[in-house]
């Protein structure tokens, strides 16, 4: 199939094509799923022109129409599964972490969210026969928790597990980390992630995993009090949809960690609740609640999924990484 260039679209001349590329809209698919207002503001073109360009892109990319369930099922075969490194965890997730979806992990401090994120950053680089996706990683670090030393320990762990001597430095070269200093910066980094994914698209290591650790930390710190709640949720909602679009366009896994709060008025059940409210609850495809157990063991509970039953998996967090308990 011949790749359609931006210049081939109706209403797009060389100057407009350059504006679109400069704004981060480098593919037909990216334009097809944008809104007219978003395209107009980003590329500095009129909103009516933006609407015409989007319609042309949708026709070209065959996006936006109805399709039968069997075609959806056929397309679902392109969805990849990333192994967590733990058999019980993988089985609960139907084979691993899915591409083209958001997997949210929430739990108290020290529950192992960042540890699992680090492990996935290693595992995704492995070939499919070893549970990986043969791709690189983009990590948006909001809490300064990325540790290359921990990656090196985990690479040693998988070297011992598979009986193959892997080089930690090679793994680190394929992890692209950016520190987000506030919520606006965090949102902008998703645009940068799209650009990087396009650059690496046809290389040996295309981007197959986006990690945001933690998704809600900056939003929680910057928007204080009920008076700012509506603004915070609107901004978070837009951010989540940008992240989800990244996963769709790159056929990549999207893993976000989330902080929790305690509800002191909860007399029955677990008082621990994730930050982000209903907006995050509706947008995340899979929700995982991680809590501490005895020693190095952790319990991972699948709280929400569109196609899998609720379940629990026992994992262990050791020097070698995440594994069977």
From Swiss-Prot:
Q: Does the keyword Plastid apply?
A: no
Q: Which SMART domains match?
A: AAA
Q: Please, which domain of life does this record's source organism belong to? A: Archaea
* GO biological process assignments: DNA recombination; DNA repair
Question: Care to name a GO molecular-function term for this sequence?
Answer: ATP hydrolysis activity
The entry marks the following residues as binding ATP, namely 107-114
The family database entries (Pfam families) matched by this protein are listed as: HHH_5, Rad51
Which PROSITE patterns does this entry report, sorted A to Z?
A: RECA_2, RECA_3
UniProt KW keywords:
ATP-binding, DNA damage, DNA recombination, DNA-binding, Nucleotide-binding
Q: Which InterPro entries match?
A: AAA+_ATPase, DNA_recomb/repair_Rad51_C, DNA_recomb/repair_RadA, DNA_recomb/repair_RecA-like, DNA_repair_Rad51/TF_NusA_a-hlx, P-loop_NTPase, RecA_ATP-bd, RecA_monomer-monomer_interface
Q: Which HAMAP family match?
A: RadA_arch (MF_00348)
Its biological function? Involved in DNA repair and in homologous recombination. Binds and assemble on single-stranded DNA to form a nucleoprotein filament. Hydrolyzes ATP in a ssDNA-dependent manner and promotes DNA strand exchange between homologous DNA molecules.
Family statement drawn from the similarity comment of this UniProt entry: Belongs to the eukaryotic RecA-like protein family.
From the Swiss-Prot or TrEMBL record, give the protein name: DNA repair and recombination protein RadA
